């Protein structure tokens, strides 16, 4: 049966306390909790959580196709076989290109690109307006927890999001195509989950050092491993037989190494794995033994 009434704030929190980690951000948890009403009597226990699907917007509502739309709900099944539904919503932590906290008292460019020496890669296509390149295409993301986190400044529970950035489409001049020409960044976001409301707040952005794995190329979909790591992907493996004439890969090598010929095509097209540390930093490795194929969304 479906429970027709909305639960109280206290009941909702009691139910969700049984969930190992509920990845709700600000407006989603607010929508869940602020609509609560009714009595504060003892509630049945949590059994399971599921999400409903939503139809993709069509040209019948063109405006909805140009923005982020959330029409799905969270359904909580209880031990008395009742189901309580909560409307979800969307709220970003930042937009790529924003300056965000680095967790050390400073700021860092979200989605920013770095070379093999971890120096910012500069977009100089507009004279007098030189700036660091940043991605316009965040892609695969894993939301996870780590045992015994040591990140300072948290008021609630530490939750980590590993976010990879697939590419940037254009340089700032709007004419220079940059697809596949920059080393894909991966970041670890440290999120502070309020234990009263469930709200997630960004407290730290860490850019993962990928120099030991020769940088990353076109990281697309991702998966969360059963052991709590982020399984990335290099969507395409560059063709080594024609690499000397591959303008995209030569530009990639130039941006990464400062040399069009230094990047080795056999270093790309592999399975990268990111392991988050308790302090919100991370390490990365590539599983070369798995071969050079499109490993996107490996489970």
Which ranges hold each PLM region?
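Bacterial signal peptide processing site
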Residues: 37-39
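Conserved small-residue
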Residues: 22-25, 43-299
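N-terminal secretory signal peptides
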Residues: 1-35
């Amino acid at each position: 049966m479906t429970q027709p009434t909305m639960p109280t704030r206290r009941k909702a929190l009691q139910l969700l306390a049984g969930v190992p980690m509920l990845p709700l951000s600000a407006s989603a948890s607010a929508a869940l909790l602020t609509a609560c009403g009714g009595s504060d009597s003892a509630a049945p226990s949590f059994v399971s959580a599921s999400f409903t699907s939503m139809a993709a917007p069509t040209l019948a509502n063109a405006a909805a196709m140009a923005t982020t739309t959330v029409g799905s709900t969270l359904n909580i099944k209880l031990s008395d076989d009742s189901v309580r539904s909560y409307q979800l919503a969307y709220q970003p932590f930042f937009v790529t290109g924003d300056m965000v906290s680095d967790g050390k008292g400073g700021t860092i460019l979200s989605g920013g690109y770095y070379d093999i020496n971890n120096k910012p890669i500069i977009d100089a296509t507009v004279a007098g307006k030189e700036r660091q390149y940043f991605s316009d295409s965040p892609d695969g993301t894993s939301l996870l927890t780590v045992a015994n986190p040591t990140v300072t400044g948290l008021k609630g529970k530490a939750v980590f999001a590993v976010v990879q950035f697939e590419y940037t489409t254009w340089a700032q001049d709007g004419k220079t195509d940059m697809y596949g020409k920059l080393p894909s960044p991966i970041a670890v976001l440290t999120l502070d989950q309020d234990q009263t409301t469930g709200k997630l707040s960004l407290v730290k952005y860490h850019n993962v050092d990928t120099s030991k794995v020769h940088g990353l190329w076109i990281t697309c979909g991702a998966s969360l491993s059963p052991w709590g790591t982020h399984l990335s992907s290099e969507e395409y493996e560059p063709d080594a037989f024609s690499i000397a004439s591959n303008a995209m890969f030569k530009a990639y090598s130039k941006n990464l190494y400062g040399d069009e010929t230094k990047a080795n095509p056999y270093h790309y097209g592999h399975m990268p794995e990111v392991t988050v540390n308790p302090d919100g930093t991370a390490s990365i490795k590539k599983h070369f033994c798995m071969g050079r194929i499109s490993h996107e969304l490996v489970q």
